[in-house]
Design a protein with these regions (language model features):
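Hydrophobic alpha-helical bundle signature of multipass membrane enzymes
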Residues: 1-62, 74, 80-99
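Membrane-embedded catalytic cores of phosphoryl/pyrophosphoryl-handling enzymes
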Residues: 17, 58-146
Length: 146
């Protein structure tokens, strides 16, 4: 589970963003900006909500507040955007990425650093955020990166 959770960690997300930038700088830059925006929003939400982490012996040490899960929010944004861009070309990659998003959330619960509601809350916020971005992109074709 620690390997799975790595793909939602700061370092894991940065590495994937760098790979996206190398592959296509426009799309990679756009995804990196949205990842950064959501990461900042996540930290603001954590401070405002100030929910303590679960009172269990965690398998990894995490600092700070629990809600919403940053791993869930940011991985949903990044891997969700990549899945969106692959959807018309290679649906299997998109489906695998959604499975990775799900596994990252499950890993955070399994490792004892989040409640289920922390992960679901992160997913719901990111789902709403991505839908807003994609609707905006479709309504403003000049912003389309596909």
């Amino acid at each position: 589970m620690k390997i799975i959770t790595f793909f939602g960690s700061t370092l894991g997300i940065i590495l994937v963003c760098l790979l996206c930038l190398i592959n296509d700088w426009k799309i990679g830059f756009m995804m990196s900006i949205h990842v950064a925006i959501v990461a900042i929003i996540n930290q603001i939400m954590k401070i405002l909500i100030a929910r303590p982490r679960p009172d269990v012996l965690p398998l990894v040490i995490e600092r700070g507040f629990s809600f919403p899960s940053a791993h869930a929010m940011v991985s949903f944004i990044l891997y969700g955007m990549i899945a969106y861009f692959f959807w018309n070309k290679k649906k299997i990659i998109s489906l695998l990425l959604f499975f990775v998003i799900l596994l990252i959330g499950v890993s955070r619960i399994y490792l004892g650093v989040h409640y289920t509601s922390d992960v679901i809350g992160g997913y719901l916020f990111s789902f709403a955020y991505l839908n807003t971005v994609f609707i905006f992109m479709k309504n403003h074709k000049w912003l389309s990166y596909t």
